[in-house]
Amino acid sequence: MSNSINPIVWQEDCVLLVDQTLLPLAYKVVEIKTYQAMAEAIRTMIVRGAPAIGVSAAYGLYLGAKEIQTTDRTIFLEKLEAIAATLRQTRPTAVNLFWAIDRVMATVQGATGNIPELQNLILNTAKAIHNEDLATCQAIGDQGLAVLPETPEKLTILTHCNAGGLATAGYGTALGVIRSAWRENRLGMVYADETRPRLQGSKLTTWECVQEGIPVTQICDNMAAHCMQQGRIDAVVVGADRITANGDAANKIGTYSLAIVAKAHNVPFFVAAPLSTVDFSLSDGKQIPIEERDPKEVYQIGDTRICPEGVQFYNPAFDVTPAHLITAIITEKGAVAPDQLIHLKG
């Protein structure tokens, strides 16, 4: 299957990003020419999804590096680290952000050459991360086919948030598995949770499915249990923003509830993510930093306030699904039980 969704494109001296805050009502591509603009694009979720954030941050490092005016290597690296620090501060939960920045920084720090050569090395490393992520997502999709239920012949798969081409370099993780199932004629229907409060399932996942003719049914988040009780769902496949060494997985808020419901109804629950999303330095999910976002996301829809003044709000962007609720974690190297994840390290 060709990759028809390209949320990130490198074009000579800038990065082109699909503005995901406008979908599905408008399709707009924005030019990102500075690292400050890239940091803002990540923070405001013009670009979102852990792998896509990582790719974007790598390009952001280059956008900053090419503006550094010095011939002194030490000064160059100091200024580059300051740029990296700005990018690291944008979103705390998605580990791919830190993984990509650390990879670029380690590559540059270990290299020789003059400043233009180091700048070019940063760009080439960012391009490599970009290309590798697309190949990785396609591999995740194919690995997922091996663990999906054998019956029925055509599956109904429920997914949460958006772990598709828009959240990666293309193709997607959870939606990558779904795309591969569609390609192999194993998919009957996708059920997409709307995913409050930002509605990425409603706005983004359904949009991706429509673009490729994949049958999709949107439901409200609180309808998932009913759908499972009625036997409508054969499997749940979600993405992840950070997975710990023991297999706990942080994903968009509401994923944990979905996993509990799936367990109660004996519906297999899969997490699809690249190995770069696994943070082996953390032993369990209690150590994952959980981003809290603007309460406006909860009390407003568009520009319309939907609750009275005087109410307090709590808006965590992610929750952590314990490993014991996860049937398997699907990576580019294979699908394994959460407690076997350590065997894929390295």
Swiss-Prot record:
It catalyses: 5-(methylsulfanyl)-alpha-D-ribose 1-phosphate = 5-(methylsulfanyl)-D-ribulose 1-phosphate. Keywords: Amino-acid biosynthesis, Isomerase, Methionine biosynthesis. Its EC number is 5.3.1.23. Substrate binds at residues 48-50, 91, 200, 251-252. One of its GO terms (molecular function) is S-methyl-5-thioribose-1-phosphate isomerase activity. Pathway: Amino-acid biosynthesis; L-methionine biosynthesis via salvage pathway; L-methionine from S-methyl-5-thio-alpha-D-ribose 1-phosphate: step 1/6. Coiled coil: none annotated. Belongs to the eIF-2B alpha/beta/delta subunits family. MtnA subfamily. Catalyzes the interconversion of methylthioribose-1-phosphate (MTR-1-P) into methylthioribulose-1-phosphate (MTRu-1-P). This is Methylthioribose-1-phosphate isomerase.
